From Swiss-Prot:
It comes from Fukomys damarensis (Damaraland mole rat). GO terms for molecular function: cholesterol transfer activity; phosphatidylcholine-sterol O-acyltransferase activator activity; phospholipid binding; protein homodimerization activity. GO terms for biological process: acylglycerol homeostasis; cholesterol efflux; cholesterol metabolic process; lipoprotein metabolic process; phospholipid efflux. Belongs to the apolipoprotein A1/A4/E family. Glycosylated. GO terms for cellular component: chylomicron; extracellular vesicle; high-density lipoprotein particle; low-density lipoprotein particle; very-low-density lipoprotein particle. InterPro entries: ApoA_E, Apolipoprotein_A1/A4/E. This is Apolipoprotein A-I.
Length: 264
C-alpha cells in the first residue's frame, strides 16, 4: 500500500498538476483524463463491433445459425452505456474523495515546485533574451543580403545562398551554446528537485498521515466495490435475455442439423 501511495504522489507531480505548473494552462483532473480515454475507447469498440456483427450476420454461417446478432447489438450497446454512466457517477464520487484526501500531499509538493521555479526562472529569462538577441543579430546581417537579392539579377541567387549558409550555421552554433548553458544550470535544480521529492516522500512514509491514508483508501475501495456490485449485477441481468436467445438459436440450428442427418 505504501508503494501505491508513493506512486500516486509521483503521478500528481508529473501529471496534470506539473503540466499546469509549467505550461500555466487549465489543469485537467486525472479522473477526467481517464474518463475521456475510456469513453473514446468504448465508442471505437462499439462502432467497430457493430460493423463486425453486421458482417457476421450477413455471412453464410450467420444465416445458417440464424444468429440475428445485429438485433441484439442495440440492447448490448444500451446496457454497456448504462453501465458506463452508472459507474461513472460512482467512480467520480470515489475520485473526488481520493483527491480531497490527497490535497495536502499535492499542496506540499506544489510548494516545493514553486521554490525551484523561482530559482530556475532567471535562467529561463536569460536564455530567452539571449536567443532574441541572436535572432536580431542574424536578421541584421541578413537584411543587406535580402536587398542584394531584390536589386540583383537572378544569377546572384546562388551567391546569396552561399552567403546565407555561414550565417545560418553561426546562428545554430550560438543557439546550441545557449542551450548547453541553460541545460547546465537546470541540471543542478533538477537534481535538487529530485532530492526534495525524495525527502518529502521519506517524511511522508515516516509520518502518521500515511497510516491514516491507508485506512481511508481501504474504506474508499470497499465503498466503491459495494456500490459497483449492484450495477454489475444489473448488467448481468440485462444481458441474460440476449444470451438465452443466442443459446436457443444455436440449439435449434443444431437440432435441425441432427434431424436432417438422421433422416438421410
Amino acid at each position: 500500500m505504501k508503494a501505491v501511495v508513493l506512486a500516486v504522489a509521483v503521478l500528481f507531480l508529473t501529471g496534470s498538476q506539473a503540466r499546469h505548473f509549467w505550461q500555466r494552462d487549465e489543469p485537467q483532473t486525472s479522473w477526467d483524463r481517464v474518463k475521456d480515454f475510456a469513453t473514446m475507447y468504448v465508442d471505437v469498440i462499439q462502432e467497430s463491433g457493430k460493423d463486425y456483427v453486421a458482417q457476421l450476420d450477413a455471412s453464410t454461417l450467420g444465416k445458417q445459425l440464424n444468429l440475428n446478432l445485429l438485433e441484439n447489438w442495440d440492447t448490448l450497446s444500451s446496457a454497456f452505456s448504462k453501465l458506463r454512466e452508472q459507474l461513472g457517477h460512482v467512480s467520480q464520487e470515489f475520485w473526488d474523495t481520493f483527491e480531497k484526501d490527497t490535497a495536502w500531499l499535492r499542496e506540499e509538493m506544489n510548494k516545493d515546485l514553486e521554490k525551484v521555479k523561482k530559482k530556475v526562472q532567471p535562467f529561463l529569462d536569460s536564455f530567452q533574451e539571449k536567443m532574441q538577441e541572436e535572432v536580431k543579430r542574424y536578421r541584421h546581417k541578413v537584411e543587406p543580403l535580402s536587398l542584394e537579392l531584390r536589386d540583383g539579377a537572378h544569377q546572384q541567387l546562388k551567391e546569396l545562398q552561399e552567403k546565407l549558409g555561414p550565417l545560418g550555421k553561426d546562428l545554430k552554433d550560438h543557439a546550441l551554446v545557449h542551450m548547453d548553458e541553460l541545460r547546465s544550470h537546470l541540471r543542478t535544480y533538477t537534481e535538487e528537485m529530485g532530492q526534495i521529492l525524495a525527502e518529502r516522500l521519506g517524511a511522508i512514509k515516516e509520518s502518521t498521515s500515511l497510516a491514516e491514508y491507508q485506512t481511508k483508501a481501504s474504506e474508499h475501495l470497499r465503498t466503491f466495490s459495494k456500490k459497483a456490485k449492484p450495477i454489475l449485477e444489473d448488467l448481468r441481468q440485462g444481458l441474460l435475455p440476449v444470451a438465452e436467445n443466442f443459446k436457443t438459436n444455436i440449439k435449434n440450428t443444431f437440432d435441425q442439423i441432427t434431424k436432417h442427418v438422421t433422416t438421410q
